[in-house]
Amino acid sequence: MDNERLRSLTDLLPADCRAAADLLNRGCACISVDHQSLKAALEHGEGAISHADLLATRPHLFADSMVFVSEAHLLRMAKTVAALERVAALPAYRERVLAHAPPVARHSPGAAGVFLGYDFHLGPDGPWLIEINSNAGGALLNACLLRAQRACCEPVARMMPAALPDEAAFVAMFREEWRLAGRDSRLRPLARIAIVDSLPAEQYLAPEFELFRQLFEANGIAAMIADPAELSFDGERLVCRGQTVDLVYNRL
């Protein structure tokens, strides 16, 4: 797609951003991923992930081209999330739902959960909410991907986000989860996290488990990747491979 056509499309955005996004998605097939930058982002840590192995075993994990979303659809998604949050906080709604749930559902962990996500799919009629995911994956993989984005032309460059994901904010979310849990969290800092999934090495997003392990370790938090069968509770503490676990990052 030439720059002149892209300029005409960007001029459409204020008046009809949905039509402009649709035209861009159908007409702009430029490759926007700088694979050298993506390789550097994935392989910078100890126990590095191989960019080549990742592409060989998971060829569709990263898309080479951008997806354009209209401002109107983003606003609609934000309003949907806000409405759901308001309804979920209503005492009458909570009692109605909990009446049909097992007793354990009444336990409040003190926080909504790290990476609680609302999963929207975009269709001809706009965004549709298909899932509320209490442990959505992909944050670190997307952070690596976003850093590797290169605009194919000036109009697209103006559409790209100015702020990049901050891994420090991700770590802060886990520390806040620990603080809200109460008990020992008031007396000592978060010391060890277990990243848990069934047969974790076989999971499609296993590379992200390793990225999170590296991130935690780099920020002074011991971390391990484990199957739930490796965890045990002695009445006082949660243990994995002989080590006390403070917090479970549940990826089940």
Residue ranges and their predicted role:
Residues M1-L252:
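Preference for protein termini
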